[in-house]
Amino acid sequence: MSDIIRLLPDNIANQIAAGEVVQRPASVVKELLENSVDAGSTNIQLIVKDAGKQLIQVIDNGKGMSDGDARLCFERHATSKIRSADDLFAIRTFGFRGEAMASIASVAQVEMKTKLPGNELGTLIRIEGSAILVHEQTAHPQGTSISVKNLFYNVPARRNFLKSNSVEMRHIMDEFVRVALAHPEVAFSFYHNDLELFNVPEETLSKRAVSLLGGSYREQLIPCKEETDFVSISGYIGKPESARKTRGDQYFFVNNRYIRSNYLHHAVMHAFEELIPTDAFPFYLLFIEIDPAHIDVNVHPTKTEIKFDDEKTVYAIIKACVKRSLGTHNIMPSLDFDFNVNVSGFTGMGLSDSSGRESNTNFTPKSFSTSDSIQRSNQSNWERMYSGLENNREEVYQESIKMVSAINGTEDLKQLSKEQLYTENTSTFQLHQKYIVTQVKSGVLLVDQQAAHERILFEKYIGMLQNRFGSSQQFLFPQTLELSAADFAMVVEMEEDIRKLGFVFNVFSNTTIVVNGVPSDVKSGNEKNLFEGLIEQFKQNRTDLKIDRQENLARSLAKRSAIRAGNKLSLMEMNSIIDQLFACKSPNYAPDGNLTVVMLDMDKIGRLFM
C-alpha cells in the first residue's frame, strides 16, 4: 500500500494556523497594534472600513524593518523576539511566535510599507494568499504601514461566519481600548469609515482611562498600588457607587499584556464584598508586574490566559491591595446601593389598547410540563376586571379567563368566570409595599407590583418600537452624558429605536450625547440615570439572553423604569396597575418569566386552618 501522509503546502498550513490566530477582524487589529507597540512607536493610527471586513490599516512611527526582515516576517515562525526555548520564560514583548503576519497574509490581501531610520528608501511588499506579488523599494517615512484588505476573501466559509458590522466593531473597539490602556505613553488615533472615533495623546493612566472609558469615571477612580518582592500591583479601582450590573470595564494586565482571569477577578470581588450588591461588578484597571520566569504566556492561542507558578500569592496580594485602597479612601461598607431607577410609568386610569399590536409579547421563558404543579395560561385575551375607581367599577368580560393559582405549588390552573370574580365593595390594599392585594369573590388576588408594571411597560414599549411612535417630555435644561466609546457606538447604532421610545438626544462629540427629552410617562428627576441604566440593562440582557434588539430595548427600559418593591402606592395607582395588567396580552408573566399574579381561593385558605 502506498504512503498516504503528505506534508501540507505552506499556504494551506498558514490558513490552518490562521484559524486560531485570525478569528475575526478584531484579531488582526490586536496583532497589528501589538506589533507597532513592540516596534517602539510613540504614535499609532488605526484605520478601519466596513468593520474591518474591507480594510484594516495600522500606521506607526516605530523603528521599521530592513528589506530582508520585511520579507521574512511573512514566513511562519519567523520572529525577532526569541532565540531559544529559555527565552519563552523571559518574554516582555507582545509577539514571539512568528505566526501572526503569515496567518494574516494567508487569508487577506496585505500591503506593507516600512523604512528604517536613516535609510533613504523603504520597502513595499504586496502579498495575497501567501503569494508575494510585489517586492520593491519605495518612499516612506520612518516606521511601518500595514494594510489588510478583504479579510477571508479566499475563505468564503470563514467570511460567512463573521457577525454584523456593529458586532465586529464592538470587538475591534475592545481590542483597541485594551492596547491603548496598557500604553498611555503612546498616542493613538482610531478612524472608522473616515470618522474619527478616538484621538488620544500621550497622557497619564488616569487621563487615558477617562479618555477611553468615558468621563463618568473622572471622579470615580481610586489609586491602587502595592509593592512586594514577588509582584507589584498598580492602577485604579472604581468607587463602589460606580459598580455596574454588567462585566465590561474590568482589566487585568500582566507585564502590560491584557489577560482574563476569573480567579483574580474573584480576588477583587472578594475585596468589594459588602460594599456592592452581589450582582454588581466594580471597575478595575490593574497592572501586575512580575518576573517573566514566574509566568507562562504560551498556553493560549490569543495569549489572553496565562499561568502563574504561585497564583495563590498573586490572589492574596491583589485582594489586600484593593482592600487597602478602599480603606485609605474611607470607603465604608454599605448595602443600600440601588442601581435601578425608581420612576413611575402611570399615564392615567384608562386602559391601554393592545389589540392592534403585532408583537411577540407572549414571552414566557419558564417552561412547565403538564405534570408540573404550576401551568401557564394559554389565554391572551384577558379583559380588564375593573373600569374607573372603586365606586364605579364595572367588569367588562367578553370571555372567561384563566388565572394562575399557586399556593405552595399544589394547584393547577383554574378557570374563573365573570361571576366568580365579581364581588361587591371590593377591597384593595398594598402589602409590605411590594404586593397589591385585591378581593375577588372566589378568594384573593396577589399582584407583584414590580413584575406587573414591567409586563405593562414591556408591551407598551414593544408597541412603540413596532408602530413608530412615542411621546416625549422635553427638558428645560438638557443633560450631558459622557459614555465609553463602546457604549457610544452602541447608542449610535440603536439611535432610531431609542428615539421611538420617546428619548430625544443629540450627539455632541465622539463619546458625549446631550439628552433633551425622555418618554413622557417617566417621572422627572432621574433622566440621566434612566438613560445610563437603559444602556447597562441592554448590555446585561445581550450577554445573558438570545433576543432581538427591539425586544431587548423594550425589556431593558421596562426593567429600569418600572416601579420598585418598596414604593408606596396610592389606591389609584394600585387600581391602574390591575386594570392595565389585565389588558395585556400576556398578563401572567413578567418579561423575565417571573409570575405577576397568583390567586388564593377560599377553599385553599380554609384548609390552611384545619
From Swiss-Prot:
Q: Which GO terms describe its biological process?
A: mismatch repair
Q: Which SUPFAM superfamilies match?
A: ATPase domain of HSP90 chaperone/DNA topoisomerase II/histidine kinase, DNA mismatch repair protein MutL, Ribosomal protein S5 domain 2-like
Indicate yes or no for the key word Nucleus. no
Function (record text): This protein is involved in the repair of mismatches in DNA. It is required for dam-dependent methyl-directed DNA mismatch repair. May act as a 'molecular matchmaker', a protein that promotes the formation of a stable complex between two or more DNA-binding proteins in an ATP-dependent manner without itself being part of a final effector complex.
Q: Name one GO molecular function term.
A: ATP-dependent DNA damage sensor activity
> Quick one: signal sequence residues?
none
Q: What is this protein called?
A: DNA mismatch repair protein MutL
Assigned keywords, A-Z? DNA damage, DNA repair
Q: Does the keyword DNA repair apply?
A: yes
Taxonomic superkingdom: Bacteria
GO CC terms of this entry: mismatch repair complex
Where is region (Disordered) located? 353-374
- Please state which protein family the record places this protein in: Belongs to the DNA mismatch repair MutL/HexB family.
> TM spans, by residue?
none
